[in-house]
Amino acid sequence: MSVGIVSYGAYIPKFRIKVEDIARVWGDDADILSAGLMVYEKSVPDLDEDTATIAVEAARSAVLRNNIDAKRIGAVYTGSESHPYAVKPTSTIVAEAIEATPVLTAADFEFACKAGTAAMQACMGLVGSGMVDLGMAIGADVSQGAPGDALEYTAAAGGVSYIIGNKESEMIAVIEDTFSFTTDTPDFWRREGMPYPEHGGRFTGEPGYFKHVTGAANGLMEKMGTKPSDYDYAVFHQPNGKFPSRVAKMLGFTKEQIKPGLVVPWLGNTYSGSCMMGIAATLDQAKPGDRIFATAFGSGAGGDAFSFRVTDKIDEVRDAAPKVLDLLKDPVYMDYAMYAKHKGKIRLA
């Protein structure tokens, strides 16, 4: 039984802070940072926004885009590394908000930045087996970065929701196949109770990101017998602008293939929403028959690769909900003081 994306929706907070405003506080060179990271600004959540509210907005957008009856959704899974509760599922909040309750299963996923794509794979299994009619997979985060840490320049906020189904007449993109590559690699971590994550600096690159993205990507192409030139678009996890550009070149993809989905320069790294946001931005532009190759990465570490084929249905639903580029328009900029307030970095003794 084939499975595919029936609908999708994204949400990005309207607030932004520029790299230069963060650099000014810490005495860093903004030009060097922006050139090195290929990131110029990042999204910031409002005072009353968290992973749950962002996930709800993305889920509502997905339901709206293809006029989905939420009661058909038999599974809601939210992937994040910033769930608002240690014990209390984000996914039940989402399910209640979209009126999908009570006949469904729900759970929260964690696998650093690829928790959302892991949720997609779980939904693929459920709908592919016929256990549920539709499954909803969400990747959402209000990413953390310690004051003065390199992560602070990129850690952003946003989320994406995908509704997975098995009826080809409803699919906007068929999921042709998926492949995962996973090892125990401690490149990035945050223990229970820690306010900010720690990371291995440059160690997060070669043995983390590049090993697992290339492992998953090459594994999928070998499994399917495809090559980069078989695809119209490609999307890779976007912790910054440099890593996805470099890994695309390593794998044989072109700048033109990754450009539509490369939103990190004006958004930042939305962690669990990162690769999923790139896929959404690509679907916003793709034509029927186009093929999309995507590989997510999560520290700890693993990569999930997917092959999508866009259907004629995309033209019917594309404009029914906000597109990623629409959500990036008309930002409201803030200085570091307001940013610190919004992110809860100001703490009273």
From Swiss-Prot:
<dbReference type="InterPro" id="IPR013747">
    <property type="entry name" value="ACP_syn_III_C"/>
</dbReference>
<dbReference type="GO" id="GO:0004421">
    <property type="term" value="F:hydroxymethylglutaryl-CoA synthase activity"/>
</dbReference>
<dbReference type="GO" id="GO:0003985">
    <property type="term" value="F:acetyl-CoA C-acetyltransferase activity"/>
</dbReference>
<feature type="active site" description="Proton donor/acceptor">
    <location>
        <position position="237"/>
    </location>
</feature>
<feature type="binding site">
    <location>
        <position position="242"/>
    </location>
    <ligand>
        <name>CoA</name>
    </ligand>
</feature>
<protein>
    <recommendedName>
        <fullName>Hydroxymethylglutaryl-CoA synthase</fullName>
        <ecNumber>2.3.3.10</ecNumber>
    </recommendedName>
</protein>
<feature type="binding site">
    <location>
        <position position="269"/>
    </location>
    <ligand>
        <name>(3S)-3-hydroxy-3-methylglutaryl-CoA</name>
    </ligand>
</feature>
<feature type="binding site">
    <location>
        <position position="29"/>
    </location>
    <ligand>
        <name>(3S)-3-hydroxy-3-methylglutaryl-CoA</name>
    </ligand>
</feature>
<dbReference type="InterPro" id="IPR016039">
    <property type="entry name" value="Thiolase-like"/>
</dbReference>
<keyword id="KW-0012">Acyltransferase</keyword>
<comment type="subunit">
    <text>Interacts with acetoacetyl-CoA thiolase that catalyzes the precedent step in the pathway and with a DUF35 protein. The acetoacetyl-CoA thiolase/HMG-CoA synthase complex channels the intermediate via a fused CoA-binding site, which allows for efficient coupling of the endergonic thiolase reaction with the exergonic HMGCS reaction.</text>
</comment>
<feature type="binding site">
    <location>
        <position position="204"/>
    </location>
    <ligand>
        <name>(3S)-3-hydroxy-3-methylglutaryl-CoA</name>
    </ligand>
</feature>
<feature type="binding site">
    <location>
        <position position="202"/>
    </location>
    <ligand>
        <name>CoA</name>
    </ligand>
</feature>
<comment type="pathway">
    <text>Metabolic intermediate biosynthesis; (R)-mevalonate biosynthesis; (R)-mevalonate from acetyl-CoA: step 2/3.</text>
</comment>
<feature type="binding site">
    <location>
        <position position="113"/>
    </location>
    <ligand>
        <name>(3S)-3-hydroxy-3-methylglutaryl-CoA</name>
    </ligand>
</feature>
<dbReference type="Pfam" id="PF08541">
    <property type="entry name" value="ACP_syn_III_C"/>
</dbReference>
<feature type="active site" description="Acyl-thioester intermediate">
    <location>
        <position position="113"/>
    </location>
</feature>
<dbReference type="InterPro" id="IPR004656">
    <property type="entry name" value="HMG_CoA_Synthase"/>
</dbReference>
<feature type="binding site">
    <location>
        <position position="154"/>
    </location>
    <ligand>
        <name>(3S)-3-hydroxy-3-methylglutaryl-CoA</name>
    </ligand>
</feature>
<dbReference type="GO" id="GO:0010142">
    <property type="term" value="P:farnesyl diphosphate biosynthetic process, mevalonate pathway"/>
</dbReference>
<feature type="binding site">
    <location>
        <position position="237"/>
    </location>
    <ligand>
        <name>(3S)-3-hydroxy-3-methylglutaryl-CoA</name>
    </ligand>
</feature>
<feature type="active site" description="Proton donor/acceptor">
    <location>
        <position position="81"/>
    </location>
</feature>
<keyword id="KW-0808">Transferase</keyword>
<feature type="binding site">
    <location>
        <position position="299"/>
    </location>
    <ligand>
        <name>(3S)-3-hydroxy-3-methylglutaryl-CoA</name>
    </ligand>
</feature>
<comment type="function">
    <text>Catalyzes the condensation of acetyl-CoA with acetoacetyl-CoA to form 3-hydroxy-3-methylglutaryl-CoA (HMG-CoA). Functions in the mevalonate (MVA) pathway leading to isopentenyl diphosphate (IPP), a key precursor for the biosynthesis of isoprenoid compounds that are building blocks of archaeal membrane lipids.</text>
</comment>
<feature type="binding site">
    <location>
        <position position="246"/>
    </location>
    <ligand>
        <name>(3S)-3-hydroxy-3-methylglutaryl-CoA</name>
    </ligand>
</feature>
<feature type="binding site">
    <location>
        <position position="30"/>
    </location>
    <ligand>
        <name>(3S)-3-hydroxy-3-methylglutaryl-CoA</name>
    </ligand>
</feature>
<comment type="similarity">
    <text>Belongs to the thiolase-like superfamily. Archaeal HMG-CoA synthase family.</text>
</comment>
<dbReference type="GO" id="GO:0019287">
    <property type="term" value="P:isopentenyl diphosphate biosynthetic process, mevalonate pathway"/>
</dbReference>
<keyword id="KW-0414">Isoprene biosynthesis</keyword>
